[in-house]
Amino acid sequence: MPSEQKQLFCDEKQTTLKKDYDVKNEIVDRSAPKPKISGSIHYALKNVKIDLPKINIPNEVLLKHEVDKYRKLFQSKQQTARKSISIKTVSCVEECTLLHKSERAEEEGVKMSAKILNFSCLKCRDNTRYSPNDLQKHFQMWHHGELPSYPCEMCNFSANDFQVFKQHRRTHRSTLVKCDICNNESVYTLLNLTKHFTSTHCVNGNFQCEKCKFSTQDVGTFVQHIHRHNEIHYKCGKCHHVCFTKGELQKHLHIHSGTFPFTCQYCSYGATRREHLVRHVITLHKEHLYAKEKLEKDKYEKRMAKTSAGLKLILKRYKIGASRKTFWKRKKINSGSDRSIEKNTQVLKKMNKTQTKSEDQSHVVQEHLSEEKDERLHCENNDKAPESESEKPTPLSTGQGNRAEEGPNASSGFMKTAVLGPTLKNVMMKNNKLAVSPNYNATFMGFKMMDGKQHIVLKLVPIKQNVCSPGSQSGAAKDGTANLQPQTLDTNGFLTGVTTELNDTVYMKAATPFSCSSSILSGKASSEKEMTLISQRNNMLQTMDYEKSVSSLSATSELVTASVNLTTKFETRDNVDFWGNHLTQSHPEVLGTTIKSPDKVNCVAKPNAYNSGDMHNYCINYGNCELPVESSNQGSLPFHNYSKVNNSNKRRRFSGTAVYENPQRESSSSKTVVQQPISESFLSLVRQESSKPDSLLASISLLNDKDGTLKAKSEIEEQYVLEKGQNIDGQNLYSNENQNLECATEKSKWEDFSNVDSPMMPRITSVFSLQSQQASEFLPPEVNQLLQDVLKIKPDVKQDSSNTPNKGLPLHCDQSFQKHEREGKIVESSKDFKVQGIFPVPPGSVGINVPTNDLNLKFGKEKQVSSIPQDVRDSEKMPRISGFGTLLKTQSDAIITQQLVKDKLRATTQNLGSFYMQSPLLNSEQKKTIIVQTSKGFLIPLNITNKPGLPVIPGNALPLVNSQGIPASLFVNKKPGMVLTLNNGKLEGVSAVKTEGAPARGTVTKEPCKTPILKVEPNNNCLTPGLCSSIGSCLSMKSSSENTLPLKGPYILKPTSSVKAVLIPNMLSEQQSTKLNISDSVKQQNEIFPKPPLYTFLPDGKQAVFLKCVMPNKTELLKPKLVQNSTYQNIQPKKPEGTPQRILLKIFNPVLNVTAANNLSVSNSASSLQKDNVPSNQIIGGEQKEPESRDALPFLLDDLMPANEIVITSTATCPESSEEPICVSDCSESRVLRCKTNCRIERNFNRKKTSKKIFSKTKTHGSKDSETAFVSRNRNCKRKCRDSYQEPPRRKATLHRKCKEKAKPEDVRETFGFSRPRLSKDSIRTLRLFPFSSKQLVKCPRRNQPVVVLNHPDADAPEVVSVMKTIAKFNGHVLKVSLSKRTINALLKPVCYNPPKTTYDDFSKRHKTFKPVSSVKERFVLKLTLKKTSKNNYQIVKTTSENILKAKFNCWFCGRVFDNQDTWAGHGQRHLMEATRDWNMLE
């Protein structure tokens, strides 16, 4: 019995009953045979060998925490062993221990597939089972030196070597066993038994127990289970439940006890086992689990957000409307928004106390904050973030705060105040635009992906504030305008870095509405807004009083404090958007410069009365050509580069917007005048101004007159801005935001224009305010030193730049005029309009300050724009003539010094795209500057903007204001060009042309104060706004009407390398036989302003500007001997006083080809001079038949017409006395005045000797007086120059004859070179745009639009014509044209324009080329789709018509356009990959 009891006890613990049909591996270990079994049976069993496959555990739901538990068990390789029937006996203690452990393991739910051979360690005596290999390793590790034992399950055999054990097991294979299920006499070997079970007792792969519901797929497990039913069972006394182990029975008894160790928290369910409870919850309470999981996740995210939100700048990307641009917006933070608003309000109130403007602005901001409080975007936590952005809208520094207020306030209507970061009081985000206070530099560190979103990482570094103290702006205060805090964009680095890096947003700090410029990416400006702004601005202008300071204009609150707010509301918003757009177009990197479209300048002009910031906004706004007003002007813009068509449009637009409200202004075509010259430069100025709103607005206000003269000024500013944009440094010069529109605006423009890498503009570093700390900081040390030295050399001469930046340029009337010259802006003369400060010199364009005293025009009324400083007003009131001698001397000296400085600076600046010119031309006494009053005179502005040509715009004559007033003609070029001021029909100020690298300028200024500056952009080979001031930023002659002599000879602006500026008397004027040295020329200038012709060679030597002015005789001449001039006399009889004058301006582009252009010598200019020098009799007698006033002053820039060389001769009738507008119309807009970009100033002048020789030749033609000291930069040009000079005489005769004929305008064109015979390569050639297909865009090809030989210099060659026709025939299918040798040779030869019709026989004979006898057969590679119709026949299949719109796919992230869907999809995938690279990492 005892043994039996032992056995039962052991079995009790060994066997495991699976309740609830849980499958468990039960271990049946029989230590001894049951008493029932007979000895024979027992013996038979002894020999039984059971070989069973692995046991698979049925699939059950396991809890995660349980899986972890199991994993630990698995790691220890604990396995449930299945024991077959064994006869070996084990001691009771050992069996009980083992069984107990195995039971405990089973209770824990250990389910592992049982292996056939598993062994336990007899040393450890635990329940862990090992495979043979594992057991061996176990012994080596834990029982070193001992051998494992492998006991046989069938008998008592035990082996220390597994191989021996395996051999032993083979002895049991022959053992026969019975099937317990069948319970018949059949006996099977173990292998056959397994087969029997599988074939007989397996249903669908499962073995089902008949005594219970247990089922398994493993034969071995099933066999073990069957044997358990044959053993003693533990039955429940309360029910019929049978347990195979004592432990299971105890668990079962819990059911009857009424207590459940596991209860459901959602209902009253109870379970005895945890698995049951888990099943219950999963089945019935899933929703609770999901809710709980979400809650925990939210808590986790909040906890994480609290820890990281303050450390990073989180911006949310979203799209607005249909715009493809990417905007960034900050997440909202509910808490702290009220506090931030209150703080902002307090700051704004304080600012109001400081400045009148701030009052309204703060109010607006406050309202705006309250209104958009919900919309405000905050970082996720209100805690101060070390990194960046203050929740306060801007509390920049006090001065800066004001500016910041202005900018946002102006655009408050449509701008949202987004608070960037609690800590950054210096960073403000409004309407997706970031503004950083001037005393901080914002560095764009890059993008980071966090939580699947892209974040911008910015680094703010405090820097020394460059802004001048408000006190320094006292000059502006003089005007009575509220001084805007000079809130220069210290964000220069920020702007340049961020704007270039992020096309999305522009960071503007200007206090004016521009402070927040629209994202650079936005390339579009809504014309409607601009128009609205313009109209409002016009109203503002009307409200402005003449002499009232801007502050006085405060009555029109818009001008002063209101001006910031109102202008902001009207203009600023539009301006900001447009401005940003504008910037975007020109160059994202160059914020200030980027504004391409001068059109927007139009608005600026009107807001002249407004704060400079407002004007800037307008300028900026007109980034697009959309405005209809501008579109009217756009016709003349064909000269624009393919990509820059917008600029011309913008410029025109600007003029259009600047529509004067007074009909008088309209009559003077003020719109046109202002718009074009300023457009590009003005836009750039506006842009800069936007960064420095006060300065720009200030200059505009100066322009403003009661009638809205501001328009002209804004144009000028526009040009100015363009030049600034050219600045390479990318640093905005900080100029005071003085609202004194005159000085502050111009100066700020210069400064603001800090760095513009705009591809369109030459890089120009503003030397504008040399004395100002801000300006000097941005200049290289060597440049600053040179500039300082120059200033010291001539203390009497003041540069505009010398003025403190706060004052903007304190331009006296003269100075302001100089600025206008620099900017190349045209001021439209009107009774009420003063030209003062109208022509600010773009700081970037030329370092030289040109005295504008003479240039300043006082129109009609003595009332000055309130913005004009008192000093300027006084200077205007001063008699002009009294200061002439002094001015002339000063000017001559200044010119010399300028040239010296140029030579010095040349080396330093050659690397830069721009050249710095310093002209201490301003009178030592700026207050005494002379302002030229023109009653009927016209101002002819030739502005080159954005590399377009030099267009001349006709303007209305201005009535004489003073009896003494010198009539100045204003020609307003609808196209950018030079500004020429004609007084009494005289060309007075000629600005030297400036080349990007080298200052090759021989400036001949009739008047001492005018030193025009011409800039050539090296990269673009075009004259830039600097040029606007360019070819003599302004040509103006100042003299009393009595004393003025008409210029009879052509003016040629020729930059000379020589330090001395040479004035060359007109070839026609015989009176001046004296050699004009600088001193002589100055004297002569003083005495005879009109006579000396000006020769300017573009620094490249590619273009000479020939200005020929035929003027009616005036009864009173400054000096009678001048009148005696034969030429002059000739002129007199033909032109009685009051008769309209005709002015011929010729620009010769010597080279057709770029290569040729490089080699151009002065010869072209010389020849042009000679041609123009045709005896005054011819020109005058012919009365300049050039009836085509349309062509008047046509200057073409090659930039727009890449290979163009165009010489346009235009006669503009300038009625001296009559107020009629000059009839100068462009012959065709397509032929709009264009200056070949190649034709800059002809730098390639030969040495002085060659120039002397040339001039000696030219002398014979008409000017005995002229001896020119030309310094030619290229010695190689001598021969060319000689040849060119020899040729002109022949032309002369023809010209003379033509003039007599007074033929059709065509004849005139021919006369002046529109139809030319084959000439040397240097000869000028006319390009005609002739579309072979009506679908072909000829005027303004867009960006990447393929244009076939559009403006090619050889476009008219018959060979090219045939090729073009063939290309047009195949409608874009021609991929390649292989030209024959004959065609190539023909193209290499000079083009022959109608050789039989050539007027110059000599030339035709010398250069005559014969047309090819037979048409050239060219080989074309066609892209055609062929369809096979028969064996050897193919049919051309028409491809998709060009008219059919092709599918376009826009990138969702960057907006890039694709026409291939696959490419588009792949591109988007790369964005996704990049976005998810560092998904949750922000370092």
From Swiss-Prot:
Keyword set includes tRNA processing: no
Q: What is this protein called?
A: Zinc finger protein 518A
Q: Which InterPro entries match?
A: ZnF_C2H2-type_TF, Znf_C2H2_sf, Znf_C2H2_type
What is one GO biological process annotated to this record? regulation of transcription by RNA polymerase II
Give the Basic and acidic residues compositional bias ranges. Answer: 356-392
Q: Does Nucleus count among this protein's keywords?
A: yes
Q: Name one GO cellular component term.
A: nucleus
Q: Which terms does the record give in the GO molecular function aspect?
A: DNA binding; DNA-binding transcription factor activity, RNA polymerase II-specific; zinc ion binding
The record's subcellular location field reads: Nucleus
Zinc fingers (C2H2-type) by residue: 150-172, 207-229, 234-256, 262-285, 1449-1471
Q: Cross-link Glycyl lysine isopeptide (Lys-Gly) (interchain with G-Cter in SUMO2), residue numbers? A: 24, 357, 392, 425, 433, 524, 596, 713, 798, 889, 902, 928, 994, 1015, 1048, 1060, 1083, 1121, 1185, 1446
Known SUPFAM superfamilies for this protein? beta-beta-alpha zinc fingers
Q: Where is this region: Disordered?
A: 350-415, 1164-1188
Q: Of which family is this protein a member?
A: Belongs to the krueppel C2H2-type zinc-finger protein family.
**Organism the protein comes from:** Homo sapiens (Human)
Its biological purpose: Through its association with the EHMT1-EHMT2/G9A and PRC2/EED-EZH2 histone methyltransferase complexes may function in gene silencing, regulating repressive post-translational methylation of histone tails at promoters of target genes.
Identify residues that carry Phosphoserine. 655
